[in-house]
């Protein structure tokens, strides 16, 4: 279920492409059982492109998947072949800082569940001579709330500021500022990362997991990471 498209998949040899142009405002709150996205519900082999002149204002008050898989841009996004890139510019994809995303598992600020995809932002960290980040705080690609208000989702897992669950994917140059809560595998960028690369990403948050003393696998960047061959985090 999505604000614009519920489900899309390719029907021919070439992947389907959605090109977003002009200005659009998404305001509706969306509630369902699973695979909920502010714009797209579930996309298979569907390329998303933003034109430089486009503006997407995500003014949704809330997005909720009672069982799980939820994100502001898409609930689930997957590709058969690697290398498909989505460019995320916070000046183009403008998300309401008061948005409330709720779900049980695989919940992310941008995408709930990502497979074989690449997300690239505009953030460039700057370092001092002593390798301390001195960059000014930029506009975050996701500034909202994920399961961060009562009643909490006590069993929520794979919760991330950008992606809830990422497999065989790449995230780079993304900055997020979420208020985030989960019971396990909670990360500022990715909740659960499997065979996934992360580089040049940053997180700033004042509310992280709401002091849940029983929470496990909680990380500023990644909640839990696993790999079958190699895992790269050149952060």
Locations of the language-model features?
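Predominantly extracellular/luminal carbohydrate-interaction, adhesion, and secreted-enzyme modules
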Residues: 1-235
């Amino acid at each position: 279920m999505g604000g614009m498209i519920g489900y899309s998949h390719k029907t021919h040899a070439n992947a389907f492409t959605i090109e977003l142009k002009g200005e659009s405002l998404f305001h509706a709150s969306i509630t369902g059982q699973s695979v909920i996205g502010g714009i797209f519900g579930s996309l298979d082999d569907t390329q998303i492109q933003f034109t430089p002149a486009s503006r997407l204002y995500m003014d949704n008050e809330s997005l909720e998947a009672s069982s799980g898989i939820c994100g502001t841009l898409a609930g689930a996004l997957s590709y058969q072949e690697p290398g498909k890139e989505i460019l995320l510019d916070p000046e183009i994809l403008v998300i309401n800082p008061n948005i409330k995303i709720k779900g049980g598992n695989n919940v992310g600020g941008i995408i709930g569940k990502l497979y074989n995809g690449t997300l690239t932002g505009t953030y460039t960290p700057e370092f001092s001579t002593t390798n301390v980040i001195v960059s000014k705080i930029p506009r975050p690609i996701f500034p909202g709330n994920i399961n961060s208000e009562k009643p909490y989702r006590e069993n929520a897992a794979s919760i991330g500021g950008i992606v809830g669950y990422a497999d065989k994917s790449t995230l780079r140059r993304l900055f997020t500022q979420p208020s985030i809560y989960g019971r396990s595998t909670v990360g500022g960028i990715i909740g659960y990362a499997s065979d996934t690369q992360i580089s040049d990403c940053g997180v700033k948050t004042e509310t992280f997991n709401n002091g849940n003393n029983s929470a496990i696998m909680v990380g500023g960047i990644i909640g839990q990471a696993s790999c079958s061959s190699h895992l790269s985090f050149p952060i």
